[in-house]
Swiss-Prot record:
One of its GO terms (biological process) is very long-chain fatty acid metabolic process. GO terms for cellular component: endoplasmic reticulum; endoplasmic reticulum membrane; membrane; mitochondrial outer membrane; peroxisomal membrane; plasma membrane. PROSITE patterns: AMP_BINDING (PS00455). It holds the Pfam family AMP-binding. Gene3D superfamilies: N-terminal domain of ligase-like. Catalyzes the conversion of long-chain fatty acids to their active form acyl-CoA for both synthesis of cellular lipids, and degradation via beta-oxidation. Plays an important role in fatty acid metabolism in brain and the acyl-CoAs produced may be utilized exclusively for the synthesis of the brain lipid. Its cofactor is Mg(2+). GO terms for molecular function: arachidonate-CoA ligase activity; ATP binding; enzyme binding; long-chain fatty acid-CoA ligase activity; protein homodimerization activity. This is Long-chain-fatty-acid--CoA ligase 6. Its main location: mitochondrion. It is linked to A chromosomal aberration involving ACSL6 may be a cause of myelodysplastic syndrome with basophilia. Translocation t(5;12)(q31;p13) with ETV6. Residues 46-697 are cytoplasmic. InterPro entries: AMP-binding_CS (IPR020845), AMP-dep_synth/lig_dom (IPR000873), ANL_N_sf (IPR042099), LC-FACS_euk (IPR045311).
């Protein structure tokens, strides 16, 4: 068909008549056409583009041959597990030196005083101070070897990192201590790890350590170094029990005068011993090598390399405890690329103020903080209209997220979400959440509202931090991503809970270069965690989803994490509460998506009436079980016993339901040996538990 015929059919002018056609149009029409063309051109060049995932999101992991059903990431260059990302960064010492080299001696560690801007230590300043401190430690009877354990008992601050780097510079091993361990656990750690030197931030912590020495509980402790100023009386008190008290500055000055050449570690050398708080018995010291930590964050780098790779201008806000590996691994990623880490002032209530001053680009969080953000946003939508508009805007942005578009410049951002983004400093491009499962509802909303990439990981200290991670581009919720390229994951049968690997369910086991070497001086518990083939048994129950991602569905042992990441052993708590006079039976319930515990209490029919009468409350057993004042009194008595027994606040129940009928074998809530059947109790009291959480929020 000829061109003229086509144009005639379409009723368009022939090419020779185009000039006459445009001359026939009015000036207003021509301007309008030009404006429309400009708008279309602008939209075409600036339209939001979907993020390109690094793999097929319908197949994010694949089965490993001859491995008993283990799966691996499809991201990577071959079947070999990833041990490192950079050849010049195979130890934590080399990681920091790489950052020093590529940063051009840029800013490294930031801190601020109230209502002041951030002040920065450069990479070279940090490296110099680390060498001075390490040399000073050598002058105080420490040795440059992996048998030398140095305790660090401090809140997040630049000095923490300087101490850590000082240890790595001279092949020493870091042993973090933290408040929630409790005095007994700290005493146990100092003795088990043969710690002679502890570096603390505040004089109060030095006093706590001295009290142990004075009671002859930690005879090996000989040197306490303080970051903050202290009174001369503290030094004198230390002298009386044979402990030298020094300021960190004095030790650095000593090291500067007696500088020693670095003694760098090897990848297989021990870098850190992380003692988990434990729920029964003494804490366990997970031994992690330099290679473990490097392998773990290298897996993260491999997964994200094509999408959101770390940069020198990245800034991380540090407020999650440095004693936990999740924070340590994320920070290592930043140092490796010459980025900056700014520390919060130490008060979580001022975190938003710190973020506005710092303007971080990377924001590691725990689900509890995400829940708070979500609740605060919706609490401000205090009318039905505001809430409807907020939900409408979120749905529009969630539709974009589902199509792979992540942005913060849409009309919905301008109208609704920019203030939320500004409260985080306005520059966040990546949020990483871990330590406990995140609510799919909260995660889905915040991915839309915050206009940045939000990743979720799963793991534990024993596999350094993470073993699974969200694949970029997969913004679905309700799972913890695919295996990292540094480890394999397999599920094994849990017969007693009716989970079978052949059905894609079972206990999660991890094997790879990020898996720890065992528990310090604890071969029995090491054998429980690590089998003869090197598989770490996590105790969590997982399920493979069709896309090759992992979903956490249960816990093998009755130990779980709350939303803030704290481990809780309900049976230990129940054994304390059962000592309350009116309590005959109790079931303590926790949820990884909630921040506190609740309980189901069955009162003792013989004790309850007289116990209530002493408190001025009378009635039949049935009446007493519905009495709100009596329920309050029982809860107060339980909490009292909990405090006397040393329970932490997160181990105390915040609300209870009184149930009048006893748990029994007949009603299916007890085993024949009269042990609680926890899954059945959870299901039986599902409605009451939901009500307790809704009332207590």
């Amino acid at each position: 068909m000829q061109t003229q015929e086509i144009l005639r059919i379409l009723r368009l002018p022939e090419l020779g008549d185009l000039g006459q056609f445009f001359r026939s149009l009015s000036a207003t029409t021509l301007v309008s056409m030009g404006a429309l063309a400009a708008i279309l051109a602008y939209w075409f060049t600036h339209r939001p583009k979907a993020l390109q995932p690094p793999c097929n999101l319908l197949m994010q992991s694949e089965e490993v041959e001859d491995s008993g059903g283990a799966r691996r990431s499809v991201i990577g260059s071959g079947p070999q597990l990833l041990t490192h990302y950079y050849d010049d960064a195979r130890t934590m010492y080399q990681v920091f030196r790489r950052g020093l080299s590529i940063s051009g001696n840029g800013p490294c560690l930031g801190f601020r005083k109230p209502k002041q801007p951030y002040q920065w230590l450069s990479y070279q300043e940090v490296a110099d101070r680390a060498e001075f401190l390490g040399s000073g430690l050598l002058q105080h009877n420490c040795k440059a070897c992996t048998d030398q354990f140095i305790g660090v008992f401090a809140q997040n601050r630049p000095e923490w990192i300087i101490v850590e780097l000082a240890c790595y510079t001279y092949s020493m091993v870091v042993v973090p201590l933290y408040d929630t361990l409790g005095p007994g656990a700290i005493r146990y750690i100092i003795n088990t790890a043969d710690i002679s030197t502890v570096i603390v931030d505040k004089p109060q912590k030095a006093v706590l350590l001295l009290e142990h020495v004075e009671r002859k509980e930690t005879p090996g402790l000989k040197l306490i170094i303080l970051m903050d100023p202290f009174e001369e009386a503290l030094k004198e008190r230390g002298q009386k029990c044979g402990v030298v008290i020094k300021s960190m500055q004095a030790v650095e000055d000593c090291g500067q005068e007696n500088h020693q050449a670095p003694v760098p570690p090897q990848p297989d050398d021990l870098s850190i011993v992380c003692f988990t708080s434990g729920t029964t018995g003494n804490p366990k010291g997970a031994m992690l090598t330099h290679g473990n930590v490097v392998a773990d964050f290298s897996g993260f780098l491999k997964v994200t390399e094509k999408v959101i790779f770390p940069r020198q201008d990245d800034v991380l806000i540090s407020f999650l405890p440095l004693a936990h590996m999740f924070e340590r691994v994320i920070q290592s990623v930043v140092y490796c690329h010459g980025g900056r880490v700014g520390f919060f002032q130490g008060d979580i209530r001022l975190l938003s103020d710190d973020m506005k001053a710092l303007c971080p680009t990377i924001f590691p969080v725990v689900p509890r903080l995400l829940n708070r953000m979500y609740d605060k946003i919706f609490s401000q939508a205090n009318t039905p209209l505001k809430r409807w508009l907020l939900e409408f805007a979120a749905k529009r942005k969630q539709a974009e997220v589902r199509s792979g578009i992540i942005r913060n410049d849409s009309i919905w951002d301008e109208l609704f979400f920019n203030k939320i983004q500004a409260s985080l400093g306005g520059c966040v491009r990546m949020i990483v959440t871990g330590a406990a499962p995140a609510s799919p509802t909260v995660l889905g909303f915040l991915r839309a509202a915050l206009g940045c990439q939000v990743y979720e990981g799963y793991g534990q200290t024993e596999c350094t931090a993470g073993c699974t991670f969200t694949t970029p581009g997969d913004w679905t919720s309700g799972h913890v991503g695919a295996p990292l390229p540094c480890n394999h994951i397999k599920l094994v049968d849990v017969e007693e809970l009716n989970y079978w690997a052949c059905k894609g369910e079972g206990e999660i086991c991890v094997r790879g270069p990020n898996v720890f070497k065992g528990y310090l001086k604890d071969p029995d518990r090491t054998k429980e965690a690590l089998d003869s083939d090197g598989w770490l048994h996590t105790g969590d129950i997982g399920k493979w989803l069709p896309a090759g991602t992992l979903k956490i569905i249960d816990r093998k042992k009755h130990i779980f994490k709350l939303a803030q990441g704290e481990y809780v052993a309900p049976e230990k708590i129940e054994n304390i509460y059962i000592r309350s006079q009116p309590v005959a039976q109790i079931y303590v319930h926790g949820d990884s998506l909630k921040a506190f515990l609740v309980g189901i209490v069955v009162p003792d029919p013989e004790v309850m009436p007289s116990w209530a009468q002493k408190r001025g409350i009378e009635g039949t057993y049935a009446d007493l079980c519905t009495n709100k004042d009596l329920k309050k009194a029982i809860l107060e008595d339980m909490v009292r016993l909990g405090k006397e027994s040393g329970l932490h606040s997160f181990e105390q129940v915040k609300a209870i339901h009184i149930h009048s009928d006893m748990f029994s074998v007949q009603n299916g809530l007890l085993t024949p040996t009269l042990k609680a059947k926890r899954p059945e109790l959870r299901e039986y009291f599902k409605k009451q538990i939901e009500e307790l959480y809704s009332i207590s929020m």
